């Protein structure tokens, strides 16, 4: 979320219901780690609830380690995935990948680290500097900021991927069920952006003006509210909340509608 916070967040909320760019059951591959019992259970449940065919579940045997070396990532995750797609004639069909394992979540080589979804999306990137909340040149791609909807055909091989995992299977099932309940509902509510005491995250604050422009452009009935506060407290019908705090207080006091987007805009989550 750090790369395109304002674009990804607001476009998702305001116009996602108007555009369908793949990512349906037949375009999704679920990747499970057979070395994690919970990974397999979550993967099967997600596939069943979303109507994803059993043939679209890829079983891998990945070591239980938080950080995987780049060579091992290539041989144990990326190469087997591409081989699976080629073997089953799915390379031109699959546009979305869902990892249901907890570990690994980072890829490392020569002191450089990428998140596993980042490395999977557009390949491992070497970052030669540490920009404060800025996108380094190595992280740029032609899809970022584009007005063209994402498809595997026009995205130069980029692979949309996400990690789906929680502390317990029951929690994961609850999240999956909530996402299903949100499908096509277009609920009413308010999207919040917070200007917090974390000054490093507040550099994005000026970009939120663009979100108001997008809201007016698409004539959305979604309410937006910007606050100078470290937290939301006891709000109802929360559609979205973006905060610069890694551990925002009172978060559980709020009523998030099914399908709501929440992000602490930090690297705290790995």
Regions found by a protein language model. Give the residues of each.
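N-terminal signal peptide c-region/cleavage motif recognized by signal peptidases
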Residues: 16-18
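Cysteine-dependent hydrolase recognition
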Residues: 22-270
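Bacterial N-terminal signal peptides that target proteins for export
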Residues: 1-9
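Tryptophan (W) side chains
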Residues: 9-10, 20
């Amino acid at each position: 979320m750090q790369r395109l916070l304002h674009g990804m967040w607001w476009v998702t909320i305001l116009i996602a219901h108007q555009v369908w760019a793949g990512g349906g059951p037949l375009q999704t591959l679920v990747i499970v780690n057979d070395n994690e019992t919970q990974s397999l259970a979550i993967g099967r449940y997600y596939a069943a609830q979303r109507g994803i065919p059993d043939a679209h579940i890829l079983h891998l045997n990945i070591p239980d380690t938080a950080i995987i070396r780049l060579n091992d990532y290539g041989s144990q995750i990326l190469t087997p995935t591409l081989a699976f797609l080629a073997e089953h004639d799915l390379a031109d069909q699959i546009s979305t990948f869902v990892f249901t394992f907890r570990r690994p979540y980072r890829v490392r080589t020569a002191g450089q680290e990428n998140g596993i979804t980042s490395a999977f999306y557009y390949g491992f990137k070497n970052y030669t500097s540490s920009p404060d909340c800025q996108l380094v040149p190595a992280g740029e791609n032609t899809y970022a900021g584009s007005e063209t909807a994402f498809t595997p055909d026009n995205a130069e091989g980029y692979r949309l991927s996400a990690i789906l995992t929680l502390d317990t299977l029951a929690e994961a099932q609850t999240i999956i069920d909530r996402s299903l309940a949100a499908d096509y509902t277009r609920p009413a509510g308010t999207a919040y952006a917070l200007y917090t005491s974390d000054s490093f995250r507040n550099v994005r604050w000026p970009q939120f003006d663009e979100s108001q422009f997008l809201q007016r452009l698409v004539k959305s009935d979604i309410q937006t509210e910007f606050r100078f506060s470290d937290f939301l407290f006891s709000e109802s019908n929360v559609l979205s909340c973006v905060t610069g705090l890694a551990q925002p207080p009172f978060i559980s006091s709020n009523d998030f509608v099914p399908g709501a987007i929440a992000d602490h805009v930090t690297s705290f989550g790995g």
